[in-house]
UniProtKB/Swiss-Prot annotation:
Protein family membership: Belongs to the aconitase/IPM isomerase family. LeuC type 2 subfamily.
Cofactor comment text: Binds 1 [4Fe-4S] cluster per subunit.
HAMAP family: LeuC_type2 (MF_01027)
Name of the featured protein: 3-isopropylmalate dehydratase large subunit 1
Keywords of this entry: 4Fe-4S, Amino-acid biosynthesis, Branched-chain amino acid biosynthesis, Iron, Iron-sulfur, Leucine biosynthesis, Lyase, Metal-binding
Gene coding for it: leuC1
Annotated catalysed reactions: (2R,3S)-3-isopropylmalate = (2S)-2-isopropylmalate
Function field: Catalyzes the isomerization between 2-isopropylmalate and 3-isopropylmalate, via the formation of 2-isopropylmaleate.
Molecular function GO labels: 3-isopropylmalate dehydratase activity; 4 iron, 4 sulfur cluster binding; metal ion binding
Pathway linked to the protein: Amino-acid biosynthesis; L-leucine biosynthesis; L-leucine from 3-methyl-2-oxobutanoate: step 2/4
Subunit structure: Heterodimer of LeuC and LeuD.
GO biological process entries: L-leucine biosynthetic process
Residues annotated as binding [4Fe-4S] cluster: 308, 368, 371
Enzyme Commission number(s) from the entry: 4.2.1.33
Amino acid sequence: MTTGAPPFSGSSPQTTRPQTVAEKILSQRGSAAVYAGDLAVVEVDQVMVVDSIAQSFIERMERDLGAVPKYPERVSIVVDHVAPASTVSVAQAQKEAREYAAKTGVRLFDVGRGICHQVLMEEKLAQPGWIVLGSDSHSTTYGAVAAFGSGMGATDIALAAASGKTWLRVPESVKVTLTGDLRPGVTAKDVALEMIRVLGADGATYQSVEIHAGDRFTRGERMTLANLCVEAGAKAGLVVPGGEILTDYGYDVPAWVYPDEGAAYAREVEIDLSALHPRMSAPSEVDNVHDVAELRGLKVDQVFIGTCTNGRIEDLHAAAEVLRGRRVDPTTRLLVIPASSQVMEEALQDGTLLTLQRAGAVLGTPGCGPCMGRHQGVLAPGEVCVSTSNRNFIGRMGDKDAHIYLASPAVAAATAVMGRVALPEDVAQVAASA
């Protein structure tokens, strides 16, 4: 099945002043040049529906609109949020999603294929310059490849599927410039958390966060950066292509997708990467960010490595590097859930999963796992969890009295070994003194 995305016109709409990346994409996918504050009607290249909203989506399509997807090849249903099904009602909803996909010809990525954003990226269903709408708030992830990715509810998603288009107000853009080089042990997750700290939890509400990273970071690391943008309230998170980063993965990067010099930004911030240390978000807001060293020693009941933020192969490699030849602390549980079946297969083939399992990790089916607190490792009252996920709100992963700390895979793995918040060097020091 082809992507079915409408071809680019080959020439950009006539503009009157410099544009940001968001303005360029929305102009290219619309009928005229648009700028922040304008209303735009645009072509949608891919619509993504997750299992937890599939029933509502189907109801909107069939009962409210009396419609079928205009372009079935541009619609994907992903069973990932509660997969495998945890209750009869969840199983019924997933059954209806499968039946709908078979009836209408839309793509179906069923139980075990993985998390929606990881799967669509692997399937190349997000491309530079595209508009990708998802029924999941972390659809900003597609900005890793300079696609305008944004989360919407069932009604807007259904309208986009039925018509092939959507309308929206063109967002203002916030320019985030990354300078310097990362210290050893500092990762893209630390950069993302620092970015949210600087912007604030609502500091980019209905804005496009445009990240200027040069040729730094892999595609997976760029996914982490774009993924977290919604935690500042962003409508989209766009990482400007740099060097050969995207072409190395086989993407065709159109020349027009880069921002113009002199484009107007609502706000500009600069982050010096060389000044960063490993970071951790403490309860119960993502922008409550501290150096890990400040929280070192906090007792932890559960560690979770996975999600659309940090469940990729490089994340599992980072965790395995810390855990190799060691054991998880007996008072701490370690859950590891690969972001997709492709990640799981690669981790099986190179021995990563064996390393994790021998260390005492509990391995789960590719998918969202306990991230949203519905199955596969929810937290009891008073429990403390260090997670590589993207949200630490009250009640997010289980009981409202549980406490969630967000960190990188390496810090999460070190914490699992020590049973307390720790850095990888803490694990190495203990081993050296043994």
